[in-house]
Amino acid sequence: MATGFSFGSGTLGSTTVAPGGTGTGSGFSFGASSTPSVGLNFGTLGSSATPASTSTSASGFGTGLFGSKPGTGFTLGGTSAGTTATTSASTTGFSLGFSKPAASATPFALPVTSTTASGLTLSSALTSAPAASTGFTLNNLGATPATTTAASTGLSLGGALAGLGGSLFQSGNTATSGLGQNALSLSLGTATPTSAASSEGLGGIDFSTSSDKKSDKTGTRPEDSKALKDENLPPVICQDVENLQKFVKEQKQVQEEISRMSSKAMLKVQEDIKALKQLLSLAASGLQRNTLNIDKLKLETAQELKNAEIALRTQKTPPGLQHENTAPADYFRVLVQQFEVQLQQYRQQIEELENHLATQANNSHITPQDLSMAMQKIYQTFVALAAQLQSIHENVKVLKEQYLSYRKMFLGDAGDVFEARRTEAKKWQNAPRVTTGPTPFSTMPNAAAVAMAATLTQQQQPATGPQPSLGVSFGTPFGSGIGTGLQSSGLGSSNLGGFGTSSGFGCGTTGASTFGFGTTDKPSGSLSAGFGSSSTSGFNFSNPGITASAGLTFGVSNPASAGFGTGGQLLQLKRPPAGNKRGKR
């Protein structure tokens, strides 16, 4: 225990340690451990109320000044030799703490001690924030940011000492002005306010408050991700959607009404159309016959008017000049010819009537021999007509060739003028005569519609659970991973966007553990091939976790194909592309 001014008696390089753990020395000691003392001391920054029983060994000059434990007598800058003490020491009186902590790499080390001082104190420039200091304090010159500044009562002068452009000594007080001085340098009986520094970016945006309000795009908070989906559409689009819904509803009602109707009415309409066509043909033939009769009557009427004019002129002609008038002779000659034709027709009709009356009188029935004979006569008649038609056709062909040769020789036209008529006739022959279409209620389904519906159903149905699958995946670095992975939607489908995932007969998907290499959880494009590839072959650019049809695919989509590579016919192996080699980078 040292008392007063002690210029110690410890030997150089050693310190006598008492059994209690305190060094004994007297006077102003160099290099000797001292016990706590009370009195006037300057700087007890590293002093401890119960110093540990340590021995310090020093060599050379200045051993006690920089290597001994601080005493609480009249000491100048005593430092703790080992680690910095973390307990608080109670000091009284006038204290100036400018101690240098040991084991520090920087000139200004910042220990974590705190002192409780009373009276007029100039608090340490190297200690932490003083706690509950009373009296006249020069507060916290260069305090460390370990703790915040506690409430100081009394007259406090000073603040955190900050450097120019940057804080050399960080402080809990942020409201500073000038060279580290507190903006409220003279605070009588009030607590020094502590505030956290507000970090603002470009435009004055506070990141501490705006970061909580930003919508999380990673999907960690579902309420923020749902806010984008629930955003109201513009009224124009809403009106269009409502009109579309109304139109679809009306079309569904029409479909229901049509589906409840029977096809018997349609078949009846078809029969009525056939009957009306027959009546129309009869009316057309009758109209044509009447047209011919009208034309004939016109000609006959004109001829009769001519004959009447001739008769009138013949009557007015004198009898001496009648030898030059031949019109009456021509008229009577034509009239006799007409009578002759009419008499022949009448004779034929009379014979038919006589035969009919004879058959009615004899009561004879038609035998099968008569029917066969009648059919033979009809057949012979058709053969004769066919022979005549053939001869006429040959004559027409000869005339056609002669006409074409005539045009070629005299007109210089080597083209066939009958080609247009021939193509028109061919179109007319190829056109179906019966214009009735297929029934709208056919039982045979449409293959394209069934395939499209099956594809949509497969894409929309949820996954039933992870199923193990085996396959080969070619990732972006073409690392092959052969093993079992967990696929999300069964065999033959895939999750796009996985690094190293394949759309084939199984492979590791994103987030699943696979036995092999070339499969990671990093989303990127993947060139995938495998057995039963049903999703996409080529480079896929899409987000992970969505269906196979929702991504933007750069490649050839092969739905429901079972080939190797880009897909083809069922169970048909094809050679891989030349550029997709395993060792290529």
Swiss-Prot record:
Q: How does it sit in the membrane?
A: Peripheral membrane protein
- Please list where the region (14 X 2 AA repeats of F-G) is annotated: 7-565
Matches recorded under Gene3D superfamilies: 6.10.140.1350
**Chain positions of sequence repeats:** 7-8, 30-31, 42-43, 61-62, 66-67, 474-475, 478-479, 499-500, 505-506, 515-516, 517-518, 531-532, 554-555, 564-565
Q: Which tissues show it? A: Expressed in liver.
Q: What interactions and quaternary structure are annotated?
A: Component of the p62 complex, a complex composed of NUP62, NUP54, and isoform p58 and isoform p45 of NUP58. Isoform p58 interacts with NUTF2. Isoform p58 interacts with SRP1-alpha and Importin p97 proteins when they are together, but not with SRP1-alpha protein alone.
> Under what name is this protein listed?
Nucleoporin p58/p45
The taxonomy runs: Eukaryota, Metazoa, Chordata, Craniata, Vertebrata
